[in-house]
Amino acid sequence: MSSWNPTSKLYAKTTQIPDLFHDITKSPNIYTLLLELLGAYIYSNSQNLSCIVYDPNGTLKKIIIFNPILKFVTTRPDNTNEITGSDILCAINSIKPQQVKAYAEALFRYTQRLTFFISQILQKASIRLGATDISLHIYHVSQINKYVHEIRDYQKKTEAKKISVYLMAETADNITQFKRAADPSWTVLNINKLDINDDSELFITNLAEVEILATSKAVILDYTNPIDRLVFIKRRNKMDESFVKEVDNKPWFLV
């Protein structure tokens, strides 16, 4: 006679899928870190899975508020499925830029403390978000003529007699050289950060400038720099993108 037991389970044991995993310590700088985190976030959403984010110093908890898809941990976990660069690239290439911006808006919700510091910087500089006509970020003096040409083209197309230009720059020489090349009808604005020696303060100031560029009516970017790629995805979907220029006409990419 068969020894079959009618109470035994006839179904196979469910195989548990390992959590997705992202390690921020591999990022070369904080701005690339944010872009790569966005890539991991988009990929996790595409797989309908949560993601464990290895953040040993608690950096991200100081920047963005809780997100149900991401779980920040300070100890590297075992039995995880690490997200690769190819995973991120496939996820990004499968959606439109407008969708990337929507994901960025959902992810980059700054903490109350960080938002306060950014507001203080803008208030001290007397800069109101959305009030600047055109903004740019200069890295090299050799690029100035290209930026000047683009700004003149913008002014011609808008038929504005006077315009406000926000300049994000890393050196005093870049600021001086640009102001020399600027037309008299331009009001050039910038935040003085050249005397900042603290990395955290500089990062917050740069984030404030990202907000200025992201809300400016027009912007000229250089996608070789992660800050400018961050600016692009933080620009609101409803904004007129016809005045978003890349200094060398390169296409936008995440990482």
Q: What do these predicted ranges mean?
A:
Residues I42-C51, R152-S164, R180-N190, K238-S242:
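Structural alpha-beta junctions
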Residues K161-V165, S216-V219:
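Short active-site oxyanion
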Residues M1-I151, K157:
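Secretory-pathway glycan-assembly enzymes, especially type II membrane glycosyltransferases
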